[in-house]
Amino acid sequence: MAPSKTAQPKHSLRKIAVVVATAVSGMSVYAQAAVEPKEDTITVTAAPAPQESAWGPAATIAARQSATGTKTDTPIQKVPQSISVVTAEEMALHQPKSVKEALSYTPGVSVGTRGASNTYDHLIIRGFAAEGQSQNNYLNGLKLQGNFYNDAVIDPYMLERAEIMRGPVSVLYGKSSPGGLLNMVSKRPTTEPLKEVQFKAGTDSLFQTGFDFSDALDDDGVYSYRLTGLARSANAQQKGSEEQRYAIAPAFTWRPDDKTNFTFLSYFQNEPETGYYGCLPKEGTVEPLPNGKRLPTDFNEGAKNNTYSRN
C-alpha cells in the first residue's frame, strides 16, 4: 500500500509570513517615531551691517565713507576724485609716531623728505610739495595755518582717520597745491563705553603713555564725552636731538534728536623738544667721501643748542 501524502499549505504560510513581517515593521516604525524627540524650529535672521560715518570709526581697515571729497558724508566710490583713508585701526597696527608715517603706504604720497625726522608732516602728493603757507594739511575740513617752522602737527593717536585726496581741490578748499591735500579727522564722543590705557616703549629710548575714554553721560545718550591724551619722549636718530610731546583732546557732543548733534572739539599740545629737522648731502651718506669713509648714521650737522619748542 502506497504511503499517503499530506498536503502542505505553502501559499497560506507565505501569506502569514508577509503579514507578520508587515506587522513587525509597522511596530518598529511606530516605536522609532515614539522614541525620537520632536525637532525644534530655529529661526535665523541677518542683522544689518553697522552704518559707517565719514567722521567716525570704520567697520574694517578699508573705509567706505568720506567727507573730504564733498564735505558731506558720501560713499568713496561715488566721489569723482581719488581718495585714500588710513583708519585708526590701521594706525594701531603700524604704531606711527607721526601722521606722515601713517601715510607711508599711501599711493602717490612721498613722506621721506627729511629722512627719519617727525618734526613736520610735510608731504609730496603727486610730485607737488606743500609746506609753509601753502601746506595742504586740514583738520576736520579746516586748514591748519602755518609758516614753515610753526606749522601745526597733530599726533596720530588723536585721530580717527587720515585721508588723502589727490588732484586739484581749490573749488572746495580755496588756495591749495595741485597735488592734493591731507584731511585729518579727530576722534569724537561715542555712546558706547570706551576705556583704553596704553604704555609703549621702543628703540631710541621711546617711552609713551596714552589714554582714551568715552561714554554717554546720561541713559538716553543725549550727552556724551571723549577724552584722549598722551605723553611721549624719545631720542632722535641723530645725536643731541630729543623729541617730547604732551597732548590732550577733550570733546563733548549734544544730541537733542536723531537728526541733530552739536560736537565741541578741542586740542592742546606742547612740545618742549621737536627733534631733528636737518638733512645730509649724498656725499658721505649714499656715496663715500674722498677719503673713502661715510658719515655715521647718527651724525648731527647742527649745533648742540639748535633746538626749539612748539605749542
Where are these regions (language model features)?
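Transmembrane beta-barrel outer-membrane domains
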Residues: 116, 152, 202-206, 241-245, ...
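Acidic/polar loop-and-plug regions of large Gram-negative outer-membrane beta-barrel proteins
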Residues: 232-236, 248-255, 259-311
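Cleavable N-terminal targeting peptides that direct proteins into the secretory/outer-membrane pathway or into
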Residues: 1-38
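Outer-membrane beta-barrel translocator/receptor signature
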Residues: 146-148, 157-160, 171-248, 254-262
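Acidic, small-polar-rich N-terminal luminal/periplasmic segments of exported/outer-membrane proteins
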Residues: 3, 39-193
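Short secondary-structure transition/capping segments
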Residues: 123-127, 238-239, 275-276
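Flexible, active-site-adjacent loop/turn segments at secondary-structure boundaries
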Residues: 74-77, 89, 152, 170-171, ...
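Short, flexible loop/turn elements at secondary-structure junctions
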Residues: 18, 22-24, 129, 203, ...
